[in-house]
C-alpha cells in the first residue's frame, strides 16, 4: 500500500482487542504500519492509519479510526509544527471517523464519494479508510485478503457521530452527550463532506509533493550546470562567466519565484481544505448539535437511538473561525457498544447492566463492572457480538437515554465547550490517545502520531497542523469536560455524585480505559427507562469525551484493557464452554461406552441382579402379554400382539419402575458403567415380549437421554436416525412403537454401541431375561454368540434381527417377541431376527440387518411353518443358537437342539449380563456367555423341550432353515466366493487349455510348414522361413492377403513372405516357446549341415533364441570325439562320433574340429556317444521338447555341429581334435542315452552328456569315461538318472561321477529334479574358473546322460537345459558347441579310463593350458568347498575312493590354442557318493596345473571328483584321490573352452542348481 498505508495501532482497548478479537482486530494488527514506516512514507503517498472501531468500543473507536494522511495531507503544517502534525493526521482520522459511521443513506453517499476519492487516489495514492464493525467479520477478512494482495481496499467508512458536542464544539464546542450521534442525514452528509475533502486534499498533497520533487530536480540541475560551468575552459569561462552567471541568477530567481508561488498556492489550497474540512465538520456537528439542542429531550431520545444505531461515533470538531483551525473530528466508537454491547446481552438482564455501570461509575468499580457487563454482554451475546448488542441496545437506549441524555445534556451542554476545547488541545494526543485509549496504549498512539508528525514536519503545512492540533486539544478539553459531566450524569442513576466525580476522574483518565462507561452512555441512552440506561447514556457521552480526551490515566487505560480482556475472556469462555459441551457429550458417550465395556464384575453382578429382578417382574408381564397376544392372534400372533399391548402396559408399570430404577440405578450406573447394564436389563425385560422391545426402546431412549442429555431425537428416531432405520422410524413408532424399539435395539446396538451401546445392550439382555420363559431362551442362545456383537445379544438376537428389518418388523415385530416369549408361535420371526444377527456377525449380515425388517416380514409372513408353535419355539432357540453357531460357523442343525425353551430362558436371564459382558469377556458377562453357551448346549441336549413346545422337531428345522433364509444370503456370499474362485479357476484352466490347444495346433501347423525350412539349415532358419513365407504368400496372396492387395498397393510376395515369416516366428515362439519352435528346424538343419558348416558359426541360432540351447548339447556330443578316446578309453570312437560336436561351435571356446567319432555311440544306454553328435539334435529336440527326430538327426549330424549354440571358432574343434587323443570318452555311456532320451529329451541329453562324460571329454578334448558297475552305486549316491529310466544312463552318470542332484534340479523331469535336489552346487551355466567354483565332474556327465545331449557347457545350458531340453534354454555362451577338448574339460574324467586319461592328461596338460573340466577339482583346491555347488570338495585317497565307489576322474588336458590358453582337463567325477574323499590327491600337480590353467582361464570351474588314476598312465595320478565336488555352473562364454560340456550336457540346470 504505497499510496495508502493503513496502520492500526496495536494498542489494546477494552473494546478493541479483548472484547472483539476478530477479523477486525486481525486486520488492524496485520495492516498496522510501524511508526518508522510511517515516517519513511514519501510525501506523495497518503498514509492513512486506521484503528478498527469495535462495535462495542465507541470510546476509543474514533481514535482508532484516525486515518493519518501525514506527509501529503499536511506537508507544510507538518513542517511547521511537528508535534501538531499528528493532529492533522488525527483530523483526517476524525474525518474518516465522521464519515466512518453514518446512517445508511449517508453511507451510500459517503461510500460513493469515498470510493471516488479512493479511486482518484488509487491512481496516485490510494487512501484507504476502513471501518470494521465487530459484526462484519467476513468483510474484514475480505479486506485483509485484499490488503494482503496489496490491492487498495475500497471500504466505506461509516463515521459514527459521537455527540452533538462535536457539532456544538465548532460553534460553542458543546458536545451534547445526548446529541443524536446516529442522525442518518447528518452523519451521511458529514461523511460525504469528509470524503470530498479528502478527495480534494489528496490531489493537492500529491501536487505539493510533485512540486517539491520538481524543485529538487531544478536545484539539482542548477548545481549540475554550475559544476559544468566551473569545468568550462578558462577562456570560455571568462566569456561565459558573465552570461552564465546572469543566466544562473535569472534562473534561480525564476525558480525561487516559482517555488514560492507553488508553495503559497499549496498553502492556500491547504488552508482552504482545512477550512473546508472545518466547515464540513462544523456544519455536520452543527446539524447534529442543533438537533440535539433544539430537540432537547426528544433529541436526546433520538440520539441514543442514532448513537446506538450508528454505533455512536462522536465527532468533536472545534471550529474556531478566528483561528481558522481545522475542526478536529474525533470519531469515537461509543463505548456504547462496549457498555451498550454489554448491556445488549445484559439488557435482557437489566440488573447486571445496573450493577456493572454503577461499579464503572464508581471509580473503583467503573473499570471492573463494565467488563462484567461486557462479559455478560459478550458472554450472552457471544454469538451476538457487541456491535449487534449495541444496535439492540440503541432502541432501549433510545427509550432510556431520553431522561439520561437530558440530564447528561444539561451537564454536557454546560461543560461541553470546555471539554471540546480540552479535547481539542489533547486532540493531537487525543487522536493518538483515542487510539491509545481505545488500545489502552496511549503512549504508543502518541508516539506513532508524533513520528507521523515528524514526516509532516517536513511538509510546509506545519502551521496548519499546529492550528489543527490546537483545535483538537480544545476539542479534547471539551470532551474531557463533557465526559466528566456525562459521567456525573451517568453516575446519578446509581451513585450520581460518586459516579460523576469518579467518572470524571475515570473518564478523564480511564475514559479511554473505561470504554464501558463511555459506551454505556451511548448504548444506555437508548435505555432511558432504566437508571442503567441513564448510566449508559452518560457513559456513551463519556466515551465520546473519552475519545476526544487524549489524556486518559494509565489506570483508566488499564481498566479498559482489563474490561476488554474480561469481555473477550467471557466470550471465549462461553465459546469454550459450548465447544466443551459438545466435546463432553462425545466424551461422555465414549466414557459411557467404556464404562459399559469396562464395568466391574461387581457392578455387572449387581446390574444382573437388578436385571434379573426386572426380568422376573417383566417376565410375568410378558407372559401375560404373550398369553393375551396368543389369544388375540394365533398363539404366536396373539401372544405377540398381547406382548405389544401388555408390553406397553408393562412399560407403563415397568417404565415407571424402570424409569425410576434407571434414573437412579440406571443413571448412576451409566456414570458408573452400571447404568448401561441397568438399561439393558430393563430393555431386556421389555424385549421379553414384543412390547418389552418397545419398552426397551422407550426406556433406552429415556435412559440415554438422561445419561447423554440427548433428548434431541425421539427414542425411536434417535436410533433409527443414526442408521437407515429412518425409513421405519416415523411409521414404526407411530404404528408400532414396539417395532421401532426393536429397530432401535438393533440399530441402537450398532449405532449406540459406539455411544450408548452399553445401555442398549443391557436393555437387550434384560429383555432376554424378561422373556426367559420363552424369548429368553432364544435370546440366551443368541446372546453368547452375540455377546461379541452387542447388537446381536438377546435383544440383538431378537430385536436386532427384527430391528434391522424395520419394515418387516413393523409387521413382524410381534413374531420376534413370540419367538422369545412364545417359541411355538412365531419361530419364523424369531428365526428371521436371529439369522439377521447371524448374518450381521458372520458374513453378509450387515446389509441383511438393514433389510432385517424385510427378512422378518418375509420369514414371518411366509415362514412356511404350519405349526407356528413348533416353529417359533425351535426357530427362536435355533435362531439365537444358530446365530451364535453361524457366527461360530456352526450349522443350523444345532438350532433344533437349542430350540428348548426353558434352559434358554434361564440362560437368557444370564445372557443379558453376558451381553453386557460381551464387550468385555473379563466381567461376569463372560460367565454369562459361557452359561449362555451352555444353555445353547443344553438346548442342543434338550431337543425334547422344543419338541414339547412345538411338538415337531422337523418343522423347527425347516423353520430354522427359513430363518436361515435371511442369513442364507450371507452364507451365499461366502459360498459365492469359493464358487467364484472355482469358476475363475475353471475359466482360467479352460483358457489355458484353449491356449495350449491353440499353441499345439499352431505348433503342428508351423511344424508342417517348417519341416522344410528346418531341413534347410540349422543356422539358416530364415531360409526355411522364407520358403514357408513364399508358400504363405502364395496362399495368402490370393485371399489371405487379399485385403492388403485390395488396398490398391502392389503386394510384394517377398515382403509378404518376410512379414509372414516374422509373424509366424513370433507366433511359434510364443506358442511353442522360442526354444522349441526354433530348435526343431534349427536342429534338423543344424544337425545335418551344421556339423560341417556351423563349426565356425558361433550361434547361427534360428530366429528364436532357444536354438542357442540346442547347439550346446550337440556341441558336447561332438566334443566327445575319439580323440579323447585315444587318451583314456576305447570309448574314444563314440566321442569321435560325438566329435561332430565340434560343429557345436557355440561352445564358449572356439570349436576345435575334433574328428567326430561315431564310435562314441558304443553305449546306447548312456546316450552320450550318440548324444555327443546328436546333442545338437538333442538340443534342438529340446527346442521341440519331445520330438525324437532331432535325436535321430543328432546321430546323423553327429558330424554336424549345432550352429544354434554360440560356437567358439573352430579352434575349439582343433582343440578337440588335439584333445581327443588325450582322453577317449566311453562310448557306451554316451551312446545309450541318446536313443532312450527322445521321450525325455532334456533328461536324455543330460544323461547322455553326463553318462558320456567321455563324450563331453571328447568334445572338450579328451574325457575318459569308465563305465563301471558302480554306476548303480553312484546313482544311489548321486541320485539315479531317471531320465531314460535306463541303468546304462545311470551307470554312465555314476561312472562320470556326475552328481544327479544337479540333473534333478536342473532337469524338468521330476526324477531329474529329485536327483539333482541333493547336489545342486553350481548354477547351470556357471563355469568355474576359480578353484572355489570346482564342481563334480560327475554331475555334468550324469546330466549329459540324462539329457541324452552331447556334453554342453554347464554354464551355458544350465537353466533352460534342465528346465527344457531345448537348446534354447542354454544362453549363448553357456553351452556353445564344445570341441572335444572342451567337452572333455566339461565332462570330466570318464570312469572307464581314469588312468589313461591321467596319463594323457599328464602328457597333455600344460600348467597354463590345462583346464579342469567343470567337474574337476584342482589338487591345490582339494578340500576346498565349492561355493556354487555348496558342496565341500574333499580329495581323498584312492582307498577312500574305493570305499566310496572310487571313480577316477581322468583329467585330460589337450594343448589348446594359446588364444584359449586353456587345456581342458576332463575329470571323471568321483562317485556321487555322499562320501567325500579325504585323501589329498597326488594330482595336485597335474590337476592343480590343469585347474590353475582351467580356473585361471575360466571364471567359474565346476568341482568334480578328481581321481588321479592310481596306476594312472599319467603317472602323476599314482594316488587316486576322489574329490566329490558339485559342479558350479560354468560360463563357457567366458572361456574359449567349454568348461563343462558334461555338466552342460547333463543340463545346465544342474549346474545352476549347483
Swiss-Prot record:
Coiled coil segments of this chain: 204-270, 556-586
Gene null: resulting phenotype: Homozygous for these mutant alleles complete embryogenesis normally, but manifest a cystic kidney phenotype during the early larval stages and die within a month of hatching. Elimination of maternally derived talpid3 activity by germline replacement resulted in embryonic lethality of talpid3 homozygotes. The phenotype of such maternal and zygotic mutant show absence of primary and motile cilia as well as aberrant Hedgehog signaling.
GO CC annotation: centriole; ciliary basal body; cytoplasm
Compositionally biased tracts (Low complexity): 1240-1265
Region (Required for centrosomal localization) residue spans: 553-639
Disordered, as annotated region: 57-84, 227-247, 312-396, 411-466, 489-523, 639-687, 1079-1178, 1214-1265, 1354-1374, 1500-1554
Subcellular localization: Cytoplasm, Cytoskeleton, Cilium basal body; Cytoplasm, Cytoskeleton, Microtubule organizing center, Centrosome, Centriole
Identification of the protein by name: Protein TALPID3
Keyword Cytoplasm: yes
Pro residues compositional bias, start-end: 513-523, 1099-1115, 1230-1239
Any single Pfam family the record assigns to this protein: TALPID3
Chief localisation class: cytoplasm
Phylogenetic classification of the source organism: Eukaryota, Metazoa, Chordata, Craniata, Vertebrata
Role: Required for ciliogenesis and sonic hedgehog/SHH signaling.
Basic and acidic residues compositional bias, start-end: 57-68, 639-650
Name of encoding gene: talpid3
Domain of life: Eukaryota
Family in the record: Belongs to the TALPID3 family.
PANTHER family: KIAA0586 PROTEIN, PROTEIN TALPID3
Keywords, alphabetical: Cell projection, Cilium biogenesis/degradation, Coiled coil, Cytoplasm, Cytoskeleton
One example of a Gene Ontology biological process annotation: smoothened signaling pathway
